[in-house]
């Protein structure tokens, strides 16, 4: 594809540069221009191409005829343009060869000329897509000699043939729309009230009324044996029905409405366990009966007791331990304070040798406090006794 464009570029520029008008620069008349403005289809020298490039590509798009690659549309712009055609067009709008370049190519005339070239190139491209020969510009505006009058006349004849053929093709669409609308109009009936009802033409036979209506099929519940046989014949997607009997027993209303009340008074005496989606009552064993008798005995035994210990309840009462505890408590019945050493039998009065001075002082101070408190208690008791004696004497 690139080689074809290159060959087209070389052949096109060879033909265009063979003309005398294209051998000089469009702006400064310098010889052998190697640059061109694609926007206006004119040939320029390297100095004028720099001026056009400074204007911006939106005003003038400049490319080299030797170094740059050209597309087919760009080559058509050069074919439909040319220095001679552009010079004639600009002179019609009062622009001569001299003058400011920027003002010239930003004028209204330059904009119109650019639009004319773009339209001609687009038209030729559309004709090529339709496999028609491209239509060159008018003979009055084409001084380049690339097209002839015969081709334009042939093109006009082809256009007239197209216009003659068009009226025959246009009425096809309304005919189709009319044929489509006919069924819609046929549905409208004024006599039937707009509901579209139609009278029956065929009478129904009288035997239809004598026929007995079909009885509804009653689906009977299958037994477990028949369910198993049917399940064996079904495919694997019916394997979920393994517990059919259990599900029927669970869904039956007898399980909910006829629950027998518990015979014993205990709440946790009857154990329930889940088996296949239903609760089953566990039979009462001999051990549970023994527990019931024991609880009755305990109730009779401790009816009037205010407190019950675990040792008394389970029969593990140790009388010797109770006696020792009671005897140890009797020793401290009159004392106001009891130390752990005195309670557990370690209060022999001898201090261990490994005590520090601080611990020794603490113990001595604690013993002194206990002695002082005991003396205070004795003094209070004697005071009370003396007061009672004195009151009895005065009376």
From Swiss-Prot:
Tissue: Expressed specifically in roots, pollen grains and pollen tubes.
Biased amino acid composition, Basic residues: 178-190
Disruption-associated phenotype: Plants are arrested during endosperm development and have altered root hair development and pollen tube elongation.
Coiled coil: 361-389
Entries under CDD domains matching the protein: ArfGap_ArfGap2_3_like
Residue numbers carrying N-acetylalanine: 2
Gene3D superfamilies to which the protein is assigned, alphabetical: Arf GTPase activating protein (1.10.220.150)
Bias kind Polar residues: ranges: 140-162
Segments crossing the lipid bilayer: none
Comment on protein domains: The C-terminal domain (317-395) is responsible for the Golgi localization.
Name of the protein this chain belongs to: ADP-ribosylation factor GTPase-activating protein AGD10
Organism annotation: Arabidopsis thaliana
Upper lineage: Eukaryota, Viridiplantae, Streptophyta, Embryophyta, Tracheophyta
């Amino acid at each position: 594809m690139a080689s074809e464009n290159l060959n087209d570029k070389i052949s096109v520029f060879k033909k265009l540069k063979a003309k005398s008008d294209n051998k000089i620069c469009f702006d400064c008349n310098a010889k052998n221009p190697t640059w061109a403005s694609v926007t206006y289809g004119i040939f320029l020298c390297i100095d004028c191409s720099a001026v056009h490039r400074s204007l911006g590509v939106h005003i003038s798009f400049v490319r080299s005829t030797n170094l740059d690659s050209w597309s087919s549309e760009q080559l058509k712009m050069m074919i439909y343009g040319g220095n001679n055609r552009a010079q004639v067009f600009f002179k019609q709008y009062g622009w001569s060869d001299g003058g400011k370049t920027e003002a010239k190519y930003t004028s209204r005339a330059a904009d119109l000329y650019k639009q004319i070239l773009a339209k001609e190139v687009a038209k030729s491209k559309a004709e090529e897509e339709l496999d028609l020969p491209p239509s060159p510009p008018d003979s009055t505006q084409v001084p380049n000699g690339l097209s002839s009058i015969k081709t334009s006349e042939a093109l006009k004849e082809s256009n007239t043939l197209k216009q003659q053929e068009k009226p025959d093709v246009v009425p096809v669409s309304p005919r189709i729309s009319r044929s489509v609308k006919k069924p819609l109009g046929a549905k409208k009936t004024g006599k039937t009230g707009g509901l579209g009802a139609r009278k029956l033409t065929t009478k129904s036979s009288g035997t239809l009324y004598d026929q007995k209506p079909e009885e509804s099929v009653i689906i009977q519940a299958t037994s477990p044996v028949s369910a198993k046989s049917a399940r064996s014949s079904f495919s694997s997607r019916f394997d979920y029905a393994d517990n059919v009997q259990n599900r029927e027993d669970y869904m039956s209303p007898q399980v909910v409405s006829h629950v027998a009340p518990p015979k014993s008074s205990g709440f946790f005496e009857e154990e329930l366990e889940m088996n296949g989606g239903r609760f089953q009552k566990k039979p009462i064993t001999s051990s549970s009966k023994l527990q019931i008798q024991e609880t009755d005995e305990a109730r009779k035994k401790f009816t009037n007791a205010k407190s019950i210990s675990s040792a008394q309840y389970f029969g593990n009462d140790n009388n010797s331990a109770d006696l020792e505890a009671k005897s140890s408590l009797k020793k401290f019945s009159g004392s106001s304070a009891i130390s752990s050493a005195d309670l557990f039998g370690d209060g022999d009065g001898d201090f261990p040798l490994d005590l520090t001075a601080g611990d020794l002082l603490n113990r001595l101070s604690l013993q002194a406090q206990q002695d002082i408190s005991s003396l205070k208690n004795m003094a209070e008791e004697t005071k009370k006794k003396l007061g009672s004696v004195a009151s009895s004497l005065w009376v």
